[in-house]
Amino acid sequence: MSITIENFHGVFREVFVGYVEYKRSLGFAFDYTIIAGLLKLNNYLETYDLNAPILTREMAKGYIHQNEGKAPSTIHNCESRIRQVGLYMKNMGYENVYVYPEKHIKNTTDFVPYIFSKQEMQSIFKAIDILASENMMYHFYQTELRLLYATAMRVGETLDLKVKDVDFTSNVIKVNNAKNNVTRLIPFNESLRKWLLKGGNIDGDPDDYFFPAPRAGKTGKRKRSQQVCILFQRTILPKAGINIWNGKYKIRIHDIRHSSACAMLSHMIELGWDPYCALPYLSTMLGHKGIESTEKYLRLTKEHYDEIVNAGHYIYEKGLGNDDEEKDI
């Protein structure tokens, strides 16, 4: 699926089309990833059901807050995006426009993601199982957390799944048009299959969400990523006895993806895989376009570190892979 300025819509369509054309006239190359980010902002702003384009402080804060729990680079990009659009609207004479202050935009250069140990992941699963035994609302999280760790999928990818995307005949999940416009197939084992059958909307229509929002009915709404991320930080981690702070940054549910990728790579090497062969396989599993993106993405445990680094250097020297992973995760 190709995303262009023709995809902009609603009362903000003129704003976004004009913004892209203005930036391009200055020599900026607006590729797919930038347009996709603006389209997400367009979709968010249209939820306010306005008659004319405005940008209030509450709207800007809400846009940024919905990404709480995601990578600092994602939040940084969202803050920069909402500020730039606000500046453009202000300069074009739109009324009631809030410009997000530059001083509030976070610097992410010193960020290092958190890697959960196997023991910590076991504590997380135990914690959510206890919570689920006390309250039915946590049943979804029993499946969601196991799905995230078993597949290294992104939270948004799991919540975007439709009933037709989970094939219980072949035990394969299809992730459609994810980040970098990549579609991929992810196999799952019998253990995860049981959880998917228990926690998913297996009786829904093919185009229904596999994890629909509570009381969604026929509205077609899915669960909100923000709600999942916040509950993980504020409820599940404390219940598991894990400090939510990793230095000056909070541990995020997205760190399960990092941890899963590291565990997969370590396991493949333990099975005797050549690291050179393992990295491309893992890159495909994660939905990356290039091997370099996978190497940068992983924060490896000490086991096999030298082997992986040497393999990565070999790959770069051979000129394989493209560093085309989006800045925001």
Residue ranges and their predicted role:
Residues 1-329:
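Conserved catalytic core of the tyrosine transesterase superfamily
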